[in-house]
UniProtKB/Swiss-Prot annotation:
This is Guanine nucleotide-binding protein subunit beta-5. Its main location: membrane. GO terms for biological process: dark adaptation; G protein-coupled dopamine receptor signaling pathway; G protein-coupled receptor signaling pathway; light adaption; negative regulation of voltage-gated calcium channel activity. Belongs to the WD repeat G protein beta family. The gene is Gnb5. It holds the Pfam family WD40_Gbeta. It comes from Rattus norvegicus. Keywords: Membrane, Repeat, Transducer, WD repeat.
């Protein structure tokens, strides 16, 4: 028995060293392609002028920390979820609440609008993803029509519909992501590869939508093929949890925000990190990131209650937005790019333009 154990340990050690040497070779190959820096290419690009954005609407109604939000494709409605166990659908123009659902658990960490605008999905510490159809009848009991779609073995950290209402992608504290059929609740594909809790995901913006990116507590951002379930690219340059990932509008790159107080840009074609957005004065983690419609600006919410706006090409900060009275937990640009909404632990959401 002892010799078996010894043999196993030797095999493990040799496999580990082989993996390390392969990692080294990969890094060498990546370095060969690294012939220019983004800021050098951007030197010819004109700098952005003075940039002013203000809070245009404040959405009040949650009784505790706002944890997640998403825009409807109609560019007007917003869904938000909170630690108070409530999920609220808002009219961002009037600040009216159109629907409210009380979940069976507190800490509703994930919510998403269906592409049709006719349903919302949400979940959190109940380990599952629930889909609620939205109707115009205010008296109808939404909870009665609830569908439980996804079941994880730990908390649900993020969810997103694919390009139709029929499938939903989820990320969980159990270290996996999964693709589910909404109608049957059947698991279509699972994605294993993160070494710790998965905290965020984002679907590629292409019409086919066959890839998505995820980030987690293992400091990694991973790109997945939804058809095969395989990880096709992995990036491990952050020094702490990856809290947020967002595809560049063209789909050729993505940004990440981390507890290491930096945001980073990864080019998928160059297969490497191409920019870091940080300042010595920023010492708090970035909780949420999103791009402007053109991709020139990166909005990032931080745990020091601020929102920083970065010039993606130059790597410089062009604006800093104050207003929230606690950490900014979630942030999304509207589908038409005219505004963005932020949610905070101060119990409110703010629409900026």
């Amino acid at each position: 028995m002892a010799t078996d154990g010894l043999h196993e340990n030797e095999t493990l050690a040799s496999l580990k060293s082989e993996a390390e040497s392969l990692k080294g070779k990969l890094e060498e190959e990546r370095a060969k392609l690294h012939d220019v820096e983004l800021h050098q290419v951007a030197e010819r690009v004109e700098a952005l002028g003075q940039f002013v954005m203000k809070t245009r609407r404040t959405l009040k109604g949650h009784g505790n920390k706002v944890l997640c939000m998403d825009w409807c494709k109609d560019k007007r409605r917003i869904v938000s979820s909170s630690q108070d166990g409530k999920v609220i659908v808002w009219d961002s123009f009037t600040t009216n609440k159109e629907h409210a659902v009380t979940m069976p658990c507190t800490w509703v960490m994930a919510c998403a609008y269906a592409p049709s605008g006719c349903a919302i999905a949400c979940g959190g510490l109940d380990n599952k993803c629930s889909v609620y159809p939205l109707t115009f009848d205010k008296n109808e009991n939404m909870a009665a029509k609830k569908k439980s779609v996804a079941m994880h073995t730990n908390y649900l950290s993020a969810c997103s519909f694919t390009n139709s209402d029929m499938q939903i992608l989820t990320a969980s504290g159990d270290g996996t992501c999964a693709l589910w059929d909404v109608e049957s609740g059947q698991l279509l594909q699972s994605f294993h590869g993160h070494g710790a809790d998965v905290l965020c995901l984002d679907l590629a913006p292409s019409e086919t939508g066959n890839t998505f990116v995820s980030g987690g507590c293992d400091k990694k951002a991973m790109v997945w093929d939804m058809r095969s379930g395989q990880c096709v690219q992995a990036f491990e340059t952050h020094e702490s949890d990856v809290n947020s990932v967002r595809y560049y509008p063209s789909g050729d790159a993505f940004a990440s925000g981390s507890d290491d107080a930096t945001c980073r840009l990864y080019d998928l074609r160059a297969d490497r990190e191409v920019a870091i957005y940080s300042k010595e004065s920023i010492i708090f983690g970035a909780s949420s990131v999103d791009f402007s419609l053109s991709g020139r600006l990166l909005f990032a919410g931080y745990n020091d209650y601020t929102i920083n706006v970065w010039d993606v090409l130059k790597g410089s900060r062009v604006s800093i937005l104050f207003g929230h009275e606690n950490r900014v937990s979630t942030l999304r640009v509207s589908p038409d790019g005219t505004a963005f909404c932020s949610g905070s632990w101060d119990h409110t959401l703010r629409v900026w333009a």
